[in-house]
Amino acid sequence: NANFLPESIAEMERYLPLPNFVGVKIHSSYSGVSNADPKMQELMAAIAGRARLVKIHSGGPDVPGTLARFAEQYPHLNFIIAHALGSAVTEAARLAQRYPNLYLEFCSSWAGAGKIRAALDLCGVEQLLLGTDMDLIDPAFVIGQYENSGLSEAQLRAIYWDNPRRVLGLDGA
């Protein structure tokens, strides 16, 4: 939380060394601090020195621009764009196409026919991940979106297993 930088740093230092923690999540809507705010820039700098993965919750007109800035400024960090920017999927896919450290996940209560296929066609399967928002949303709903997107078994395996394993740094990937 950018409003509580010292406390956030203390939490990162406490939890990130543990093997079951792989990164941090930023939800600027909850904190009320825009991703473009200088306080968020300070938080991101603190994260960059401690983590390898950041999940940024979608929301707000500043998100695409700040994602591009973060991706350029911190190329060693992997960024997961929560909900693939919601209804701005095309913009999210273009960002993921341009920045190899940006990844999309599509968990949401909005099925948006064709959004996963359209994103894949723009940025490639390597930039897509499975996200479920469990236990807020039944994972079967989200998995159904992937299963009904006309993807091959190899593409589904990449999204469900290979890409997350690589991005999360699991099993030495």
Q: Across the structure, where does each feature detected by a protein language model lie?
A:
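Mid-to-C-terminal alpha-helical segments outside catalytic/metal-binding sites
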Residues: 125-127, 140-173
